[in-house]
């Protein structure tokens, strides 16, 4: 027997008569109280998004799944709910959470509370732990051999021991204060997001299953991804990298490496590349002749004197402003909708055949010659801009 209530329900008076109720879904209402003391057969409760100041579940010993996200609970007593396997209590003002009796718990979702500590020493069956956006300064995970997903970002962690979590596939630990991260035992790892920590080194040589790597906003001076041949997404922006070897990463579709110190970037093996952001580096050349699948290119604020895009016919967005370009031929890039090439000493810009331009900026350059033909189609706003900025051919 189950019950699902629609929105705008203010009271559940009379629910005590449903002695055999097993599932109750009453989320998104205005319930200020919820008495389930007579519903002892209840196994699943979804009461999220209600202004509940308290929730007494001491009589609901058969409860297996509980979702009380975004209520007003300052306390949550689950000591009698020993059958619980899944708990979601996000967005409450909880300062503590006692789960010592919930030894069957496999999924714990407790983000956006005010937790400063989380003792999970009795919850060795955990497979998913999402405890982000709290105030945690430490997290002991040594007992969780089965842990697959860990989201502990937006906390105050200074260290993270994952040596026993060999089943871990997804690790999101960004926005902490980590100075080191040992992943040598996490060979099953598929996704890693460790951006905005204090990492000076990152050894990924044992993480050959990795497909997504986000490690931006760290003081990394080098990054070796030569063994991570399955990578499809790499975001390593805002580091201190002087070199980046991607010749072994042929599956890459997205590379995001702005704000480093790169002087060269070899992309000849990355034929699947669709999005490239390499702005604010020290690149003097950029060969994209093998990257025919690329649709978005952000190479602004480098030192490029030339840019050949004749083979990149799938390109839809181009940001090459802030370089040293004197000419730019885009006549073969007929899918382009956005072009930003300002802050270059351009004397010639060829937009012949372009019929999809929505935005174009080439700066206040009275010497520029904009070449167009009958196939060139721009909006009235774009044409007005062009007429005011270009020299008449």
Which residue ranges define each predicted feature?
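Leucine-rich repeat
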Residues: 17-21, 38-42, 51, 59-63, ...
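N-terminal non-cleavable signal-anchor helices
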Residues: 65, 108, 149, 191, ...
